[in-house]
Amino acid sequence: MRVLLTSLPGIGHLFPMVPLGWALQAAGHTVLVATDREFLPVVTGAGLSATAVLDPVDPVELFKPVEPFGDPLSPAERTGHRCAEAGVRALPAMRALVDVWHPDLVIAEPMELAGPAAATNAGVPWVRHSYGLIPPGPLLSVAAEVLDAELAVLGLSALAKPARTIDVCPDSLRPSDGVATVPMRYVPYNGPAGVPDWLLAGPPARPRVCLTLGTSLPRRDPHVAPLWRLLLDELVALGQEVVIAIDESHRPLLGHLPDGVRAARIPLCDLLPTCTAIVHHGGSGSTMAAASFGVPQLVVPHFADHFTNAERLTAVGAGLSLPHDTDDLARISAACELITGDGPHRAISRRLADENARRPTPAVVAEGLAAEQRSMTPA
């Protein structure tokens, strides 16, 4: 089976799909990722073959808020518009790739629409692959409406519904939305990186907390440092061993670090099993990785799906949330003390990890896709 993976050129969009790509390859299937030239090394660094056929697009721009005055669309609907427009721009190159490569199946993350549109118009079934919580209905419906209107102008068929939707979110974390899905275990992948000796040296002497701003937030907002510095100082004051997972290029944002605080590019999949808590921005990669390891989460959401992730973690009791513009030291201190303590959020976080571990592995899902591919038809 020839499988084409399509994703926006963003780590948070592609990396959750990588384990399924590996599983398909290991089962003997041919996997190709469609991307742009700048993102090509990221894909190939994950051990997947890729072709640079797309024009560059910055996923951060798709989620950038607009001034509310005069804009009748909600943030989710506005993002849906932008995703559809990006899909239309990428469609000619994606159709050309599908025509020459002849995939048997296209697998796309929710924000990438050129792959599904090209698959639809080539009579190829496509599958949606979530990267966390499934995006809100208004986002997906507006994206489909805008895309279908553009496809009609081009004389092309409207977007077919996905033949399957692969869901990597634990059931109790995901809101009830009635969407039928194929459950799959979330397997954290954070890119190639060396593991430092100190991380392999056994349990830490003090409780260890991971602090991370993710990959997109420092690029989008270089002025995030003050609140994160307050969080860092409070965690240190509580006697925690703080490890900051951050790209080296963003390291200067944090200024001089207190003694004993480490900051480096460390994969969360290696760091989190040693941690008692994580403080992060609410991105799906950090949220899902922490959930998969049963680590309580303190979330400071800034944009896009950060808010939804924070709301769901708070609702199920697996985490806490702070507004990104707070400077209330008492509130910050209380949140840090709670998330590093032994409250009920610790048992609930462990339950999320247990739920994730019971889900079918990517290898099992890959086997199912191969068995069912011939019966999938674009709807």
Swiss-Prot record:
Keyword terms, alphabetized: Antibiotic biosynthesis, Glycosyltransferase, Transferase
Highest taxon of the lineage: Bacteria
GO molecular function: hexosyltransferase activity; UDP-glycosyltransferase activity
Keyword Transcription regulation set for record: no
Stored InterPro entries: EryCIII-like_C, EryCIII-like_N, Glycosyltransferase_28, UDP_glucos_trans
Catalytic activity: dTDP-4-O-demethyl-beta-L-noviose + novobiocic acid = desmethyldescarbamoylnovobiocin + dTDP + H(+)
Function: Catalyzes the transfer of L-noviose from dTDP-4-O-demethyl-beta-L-noviose to the phenolic oxygen of novobiocic acid, creating the full ABC ring system in the novobiocin biosynthesis pathway. Novobiocin is an aminocoumarin family antibiotic that targets bacterial DNA gyrases. Also shows activity with variant coumarin aglycones, suggesting it may be a promiscuous catalyst for noviosylation of a range of planar scaffolds. Does not show activity with TDP-L-rhamnose.
Family recorded in the similarity comment: Belongs to the glycosyltransferase 28 family.
UniProt protein name: L-demethylnoviosyl transferase
